[in-house]
Amino acid sequence: MVCLSFFFLTIPLIISVKGVSLEKIKPIIDSNHIHFGENKVQEALEKWSKIKEENKNINLHLIGKLQTNKVKYCLPLFDYIHSLDSIKLADKIANEQVKKNFKPKIFLQINIGDEQQKSGIDFKDAENLYTKIKNDFDLNIIGLMCIPPNVSNTKPFFEKMNQISKILNLNELSMGMSNDYLDAAKNSATFVRIGSKIFGER
């Protein structure tokens, strides 16, 4: 697995490949890295449909916002969805996974900084919404995801995510990117999402 030298802990690394050509991705696949993240469903369909047929061990993660009208294109392409943020979306995924006979692993996206411009569940409503989704839909929810505010110190937000995950008894935490992955790792991140540190700014 590539790029784990960034870390003092062994944490699965999702390489964010939004806008990255297959020419640049192929050597990473050839090095046996398996976790890749895409932000947009359409781009992922164009890039990964054939590659995943040829490389069955690859795990593709949707790390961007998922619109309800795109759910039908997500499965079975994406093994992980990191952006469940509403009852309506939960219903769409639940129906589609029955049609496709494929059950992705799912993260609830938490709006940990209470930012109006960002997607995600209000962290104050996380417990109630998670309970309702868990009771109403047969989804494989494994953890929480967040994108903290763009501030110099993101540590308090990761600490809060860690607390929420313990309250909900969810073991997986998808948090930390190129500029703050160390603080995320110190607060129990189980997946980090790195792009610009590998490919440069896009």
For each feature predicted by the language model, list its residue ranges.
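Expand to "…catalyze enediolate/carbanion chemistry for C-C bond making/breaking, isomerization
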Residues: 198-200
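Conserved alpha/beta-domain cores
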Residues: 1-172, 177-179, 185-187
